[in-house]
C-alpha cells in the first residue's frame, strides 16, 4: 500500500516541501535561517493577533491600551515584549539570510532572489507601521519624519504625503490606516513566502561550494528537520533571554512618553534594524538625493545577479571576494552605529564616507575583484 503522505493531495504538498525534498548533503548552518524566518513569521502573527484583541487604534487611547496590555492582561507584558523583540530576531535572521545569499551566490536563482527582495521590503514596511502603533514620542515623530520624505517627490510629493496621513498631519486617520496595514501585511508576507518556496523548489537549494549537487542529495527529513529544530531552539532561547531579562534593550526610552506633536525628541531615530538605511539617508544634504539613496540602499539587491562577473558562483574559494564581502559587513555595522548617533562632527563625515563605501563595494569593488580572480584562475 502506498504511503498516504505520497498520495493525499494536501499531504503530498507538505511531503514534497518538508519531508522527501531532495536537499544537498553539505549545506551548513547558514541554511537554517529560512526555516527560522518562517518560525519568526508564525510567532509574530500569533503574538500580534493576541495584542490586536486588546489594542485600540485611536490617538486618545492607543498609548493607554498598550499600558493596559502590559499591566492588566494576563501575560500581556510577555506577549507585547515577545512581539517587539520578535521583530528584532526577525531582522537578525533576515539579514543573515541575505548575507548567506550574497556570500554563496544564491542570488543566481533570480526569481527566488527577487521575491526575497519583495519580502524584505514588505517586512520593513510592516515593522515601520507597527512601530507607530504604541503612539509614543518616537512612534509619532518617526512616522512624521519618514512619511514626510515622500514630499521630496516632484509635483505629487505634498499631495501624496497628505493622502497617506489622511489629513494635514500625522493624526487619528494615520494611526487607523497604519494599524490596518500592520494587520494585513503579514498575510501578504505569508503568500509571498509560499511563492518564494515554490520557486526555490523548482531549482533546488544551492550549497556552500556553489557547484551543482544533483548527484549527492539526501531527504530533508530527518537530516535537516533535526538541524532546523536545533536552530529553532537557539532562536527561542535567545528571544526568551532578551524578552525576560532585558525587554527594553533594543527599544527607545522616548517611546514611553505619550506622543506630543508640540514637543520634538532630541534625537529622532528608527529601530536598530533601520539605522544603516537611516544613516545613508542622513549622509546626503539634499532631501530628494537622500530619499533616492535610501531606496537604492535596499533596491540595489535586485541588481546583484547582474553584477556577477565571477566564473565561480560561491565565495568559498575566492579569498579576495571574501575580503570585500566582510568589509561590506563591517561597513553596514558602522552605518548602523552612525545612524543612532546625533548629527554632529565626526559622525556626519563618517556617515558620508561609510555611505560612499557601501555603494562602491557593491557596484564597483565586488565585480572588479571577481574579474581579477578570474584572471588568477588562469595562472
From Swiss-Prot:
Lineage: Eukaryota, Metazoa, Chordata, Craniata, Vertebrata
Additional information: Heme 1 (or BL or b562) is low-potential and absorbs at about 562 nm, and heme 2 (or BH or b566) is high-potential and absorbs at about 566 nm.
UniProt entry tagged with the keyword Mitochondrion: yes
Binding site for heme b b562: 83, 182
GO cellular component annotations of the record: mitochondrial inner membrane; respiratory chain complex III
Locations listed in the record: Mitochondrion inner membrane
Predominant place of localization: mitochondrion
GO biological process: mitochondrial electron transport, ubiquinol to cytochrome c
Residues spanning the membrane: 33-53, 77-98, 113-133, 178-198, 226-246, 288-308, 320-340, 347-367
Protein family membership: Belongs to the cytochrome b family.
Keywords annotated in UniProt: Electron transport, Heme, Iron, Membrane, Metal-binding, Mitochondrion, Mitochondrion inner membrane, Respiratory chain, Transmembrane, Transmembrane helix, Transport, Ubiquinone
Oligomeric and partner information: The cytochrome bc1 complex contains 11 subunits: 3 respiratory subunits (MT-CYB, CYC1 and UQCRFS1), 2 core proteins (UQCRC1 and UQCRC2) and 6 low-molecular weight proteins (UQCRH/QCR6, UQCRB/QCR7, UQCRQ/QCR8, UQCR10/QCR9, UQCR11/QCR10 and a cleavage product of UQCRFS1). This cytochrome bc1 complex then forms a dimer.
Residues bound to heme b b566: 97, 196
Record-linked Pfam families: Cytochrom_B_C (PF00032), Cytochrome_B (PF00033)
Function: Component of the ubiquinol-cytochrome c reductase complex (complex III or cytochrome b-c1 complex) that is part of the mitochondrial respiratory chain. The b-c1 complex mediates electron transfer from ubiquinol to cytochrome c. Contributes to the generation of a proton gradient across the mitochondrial membrane that is then used for ATP synthesis.
Entry cofactors: heme b
Protein's UniProt name: Cytochrome b
Record: residues binding a ubiquinone: 201
